[in-house]
Structures are given as structure tokens and as C-alpha cells.
């Protein structure tokens, strides 16, 4: 199977690919993880799917979306700042044109694993966010994520550290943390072979 990585902003994304992203997010977040989300027609979207959003996503040979990220600038409204500010403790929410929030990371359940650790799609998506950061002058990503993803990042050696109050919070049924992922040589080595 050939995997194509694509990037688009909200206003330019082809409608079928956008629908594929929302369908995958529904499958992962609503069906698999059972998050309490408002969905319509088996598609998951929220108020952050707007003109500020960018998407990096993977499509297979048949143009099915098999993985995705949503990227939001920290200079406007974004999830950590507006939905989960309690995770920051006494720290202010990042507000910097060179810091971007990653959210809604999803990979299809049928992605085959390589080296018993990560799917090819997952690794290509991490490579893509690294390359995107370098090309756009992004120095850091921030994300509200699960402790399982935190462990995964450490296993594949993507640099990350907790920010905010640095505590584990239970969001729904998910143990969650806020992470910073600096764009540096360690990130490059972790995702580029």
C-alpha cells in the first residue's frame, strides 16, 4: 500500500478528504475511545475546525484517509487555552506565532505496525509535522494528549516534556497531560530515517 501525506488549510481542503478526516476522527474518538463528543452523520468536528486550522493527513491508494493531525496557531483560540486551561496551572497559555497546537491525532485501527512499535502511517505523520515545522518556522508544538501517547513519544525518542501544572488529569476516561514538543535535532533523528 502506498501512503500519501497531504497538507491543507481548512479553506482549501478537498471536501471528500475533509469528510474522510472527520469520519476517521469519529471512528477513533467517538467509537473507539468513547469520548463524549457531539457528532453528526458519523462525522466528528468542533468549533476549532475553522479558517485557522491546518490539517496534515495520510491517504492510502484508494484516497481513504488513514491518519490525521489538526494544527492550530497559539495566537488565536485553541483547545489548550480555551477548553483545558485548568491543565496549565499557574502558567499562561502559549501565545506565539512559532508555537502551534497539535490536536485530533488519529490513526485508523487497521494500520500495520513496523518494528512492533508504530505504524508506518504514524511515523509518516510525525515526519510530516517535523518537516512542516521546519518549513514554517515553528519552534515548538504543544498538545493535550493521553499518557499513552506520551509514553509512545518517549519510546520513539521524539522530544517532549510536560508543561502547565505537569500533572495527570482524567479527561473523560483518558489520563491526559499537556506536552511541549520542541523542534530540534532530536526530533529530526527520531522521525527521519
UniProtKB/Swiss-Prot annotation:
<keyword id="KW-0071">Autoinducer synthesis</keyword>
<comment type="similarity">
    <text>Belongs to the autoinducer synthase family.</text>
</comment>
<dbReference type="GO" id="GO:1905087">
    <property type="term" value="P:positive regulation of bioluminescence"/>
</dbReference>
<dbReference type="GO" id="GO:0008218">
    <property type="term" value="P:bioluminescence"/>
</dbReference>
<protein>
    <recommendedName>
        <fullName>Acyl-homoserine-lactone synthase</fullName>
        <ecNumber>2.3.1.184</ecNumber>
    </recommendedName>
</protein>
<comment type="function">
    <text>Required for the synthesis of OHHL (N-(3-oxohexanoyl)-L-homoserine lactone) also known as VAI or N-(beta-ketocaproyl)homoserine lactone or 3-oxo-N-(tetrahydro-2-oxo-3-furanyl)-hexanamide, an autoinducer molecule which binds to LuxR and thus acts in bioluminescence regulation.</text>
</comment>
<dbReference type="InterPro" id="IPR018311">
    <property type="entry name" value="Autoind_synth_CS"/>
</dbReference>
<keyword id="KW-0455">Luminescence</keyword>
<dbReference type="GO" id="GO:0009372">
    <property type="term" value="P:quorum sensing"/>
</dbReference>
<dbReference type="GO" id="GO:0061579">
    <property type="term" value="F:N-acyl homoserine lactone synthase activity"/>
</dbReference>
<keyword id="KW-0673">Quorum sensing</keyword>
<dbReference type="Pfam" id="PF00765">
    <property type="entry name" value="Autoind_synth"/>
</dbReference>
<dbReference type="GO" id="GO:0052008">
    <property type="term" value="P:symbiont-mediated disruption of host cellular anatomical structure"/>
</dbReference>
<keyword id="KW-0808">Transferase</keyword>
<dbReference type="GO" id="GO:0007165">
    <property type="term" value="P:signal transduction"/>
</dbReference>
<dbReference type="InterPro" id="IPR001690">
    <property type="entry name" value="Autoind_synthase"/>
</dbReference>
<dbReference type="InterPro" id="IPR016181">
    <property type="entry name" value="Acyl_CoA_acyltransferase"/>
</dbReference>
<keyword id="KW-0949">S-adenosyl-L-methionine</keyword>
Amino acid at each position: 500500500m502506498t501512503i500519501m501525506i497531504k497538507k491543507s488549510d481548512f479553506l482549501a481542503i478537498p471536501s471528500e478528504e475533509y469528510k474522510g478526516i472527520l469520519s476517521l476522527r469519529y471512528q477513533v474518538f467517538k467509537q473507539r475511545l468513547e469520548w463524549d463528543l457531539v457528532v453528526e452523520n458519523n462525522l466528528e468536528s468542533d468549533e476549532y475546525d475553522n479558517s485557522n486550522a491546518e490539517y496534515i493527513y495520510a491517504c492510502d491508494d484508494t484516497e481513504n484517509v488513514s491518519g490525521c493531525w489538526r494544527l492550530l496557531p497559539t495566537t488565536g483560540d485553541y483547545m489548550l487555552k480555551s477548553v483545558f486551561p485548568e491543565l496549565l496551572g499557574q502558567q499562561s497559555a502559549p501565545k506565539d506565532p512559532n508555537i502551534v497546537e497539535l490536536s485530533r491525532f488519529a490513526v485508523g485501527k487497521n494500520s500495520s505496525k513496523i518494528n512492533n512499535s508504530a505504524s508506518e502511517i504514524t511515523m509518516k505523520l510525525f515526519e510530516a509535522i517535523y518537516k512542516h515545522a521546519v518549513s514554517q518556522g515553528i519552534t515548538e508544538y504543544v498538545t493535550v494528549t493521553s499518557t499513552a501517547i506520551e509514553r509512545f513519544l518517549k519510546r520513539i525518542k521524539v522530544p517532549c516534556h510536560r508543561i502547565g501544572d505537569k500533572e495527570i488529569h482524567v479527561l473523560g476516561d483518558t489520563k491526559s497531560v499537556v506536552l511541549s514538543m520542541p523542534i530540534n535535532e532530536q526530533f529530526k533523528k527520531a522521525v527521519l530515517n
